[in-house]
Amino acid sequence: MSILKCLGVRGNQLCAARNYLKVLGFSSFHTAPNSSIEIQTQDEEVVIALGSNVGDRLHNFKEALKLMRKSGIHITRHASLYETAPAYVTDQPRFLNSAVRADTKLGPHELLAALKRIEKDMGRTDGIRYGPRPIDLDILFYGKFKVRSDILTVPHERIWERPFVMAPLMDLLGTAIDSDTVASWHSFSGHSGGLNALWEKLGGESLIGEEGMYRVMPVANGLLDWSRRTLVMGILNLTPDSFSDGGNFQSVKSAVSQARLMISEGADIIDIGAQSTRPMASRISAEEELGRLIPVLEAVMSIPEVEGKLISVDTFYSEVALEAVRKGAHIINDVSAGKLDASMFKVMAELDVPYVAMHMRGDPSTMQDSENLKYDNVCKDISSELYSRVREAEISGIPAWRIIMDPGIGFSKKTEDNLAALTGIPDIREEISKRSLAISHAPILIGPSRKRFLGEICSRPSAVDRDPATIASVTAGVLCGANIVRVHNVKDNLDAVKLCDAILKQKSSPIKFKQ
């Protein structure tokens, strides 16, 4: 249903109205919900806010998104996920908030009716205004139009006063305006600087972590606020041919012993890999990978020390990812960002676990070929190529709040490229922010541990002698904005990470002067 339908135009008025709207670009109109006729038209882009504070909030979001898709609402972008303190009525549980951009042929009142139907089907009842609810769905924007009726006001009239609405809304935009529709949304703010200026007036990014609002990632039946400290991911290779420790942990007993050691040394995450991704590595089948992985994964998941820790599985096979999550894995770490298995994104969309998308050209056997080592601008090229993979993942149904990005240190890069990527994390975020603020806010994982470029710089041909260089590279990466570090030597790198976090915390704290 089109916007013209809601205007109530008929007969020979139709062409004139269409031409008028084309010239106008966007419009404001007043309409009653029943003043319409049925006509077909192109999709309108909309923004819908989501909130929940009753029951399983994450499940409520997933169910609402599924029902929205079934109702003719094609979701194209997701905001980050926020846990927020309740507003207005404060004696109630904390909320999860987010928002989505979507395309729909539904007219504004049809869209409203569809969302109200979803709310009702999910158990929402008429109760206290601003009170507890399993799901709350609000239309923030509808195309280029302002809508005024007895039951609907668009843009939503309280967008501008609510940080828990503005933060997800800003996530759905980029710092660059990507369409006339987005330009109209900025114009609706009433500020010369658009929505960006309005968000900054409210407090902008300084509000995140303050005022009871936290950007979070759902994982292992909890919510992870990765801004509080840097996480350490310990590497557990089950392969006979990994470049650093191949063959050391092929038995279940030795693998479990190594997992216990890394946990005792302070690892937050254990990343289990059963397929080598070193340069020139030969690929094994999913069946062979599962044969190596599952006995160890089951054994590690059963040890008491794993309580409170996260288990990641390093794989580019969707079949392996599916079985790993069934066995209890909390994260899937894919060095190919979905390029080596066409089913990966579809499977991950159903698994509801965080997904690490890494930048790599080619595959492990070809990534160091000359054609894969040519960059015009390393950080810009990584940003563009990685963002294109993440966008495909998002369109496939993996929400931005489950994405972790990895610039791919040591993969399809020369030594100088690795250094540029390691210290260029702010540039990578900035480039991605032009297209999507949500994706630019995603956690960034780096994995420089014992990589060849460190050996080249420090003249350390043996990988096991590169731990001091690894510590230095981890330090550089964390100080430049990395949120997760993937390392072989947990103990020493954890010390480096703690120092970096202390430096960053002191740097971000306001300076107080004695009177």
UniProtKB/Swiss-Prot annotation:
Outline the inducing conditions.
Not induced by light.
Per the record, which residues fall in region DHPS? 232-515
The GO biological-process annotations, alphabetized, read as:
folic acid biosynthetic process; tetrahydrofolate biosynthetic process
Query: Which cofactor(s) does the record list?
Result: Mg(2+)
Where does this protein come from, organism-wise?
A: Pisum sativum
* Transit peptide segment: 1-28
Protein known as:
Folate synthesis bifunctional protein, mitochondrial
Under which EC number(s) is this enzyme classified?
Answer: 2.7.6.3, 2.5.1.15
- What pH-dependence text does the entry carry? Optimum pH is 9.
Q: Which residues bind Mg(2+)?
A: 237
Q: Which top EC class applies here?
A: transferase
**What's an example of a GO molecular-function annotation for this chain?**
dihydropteroate synthase activity
Family assignment? In the N-terminal section; belongs to the HPPK family.
Q: Name one Pfam family in it.
A: Pterin_bind
Concerning PROSITE patterns, the annotation shows:
DHPS_1, DHPS_2, HPPK, PTERIN_BINDING
Thermal dependence of catalysis: Optimum temperature is 50 degrees Celsius.
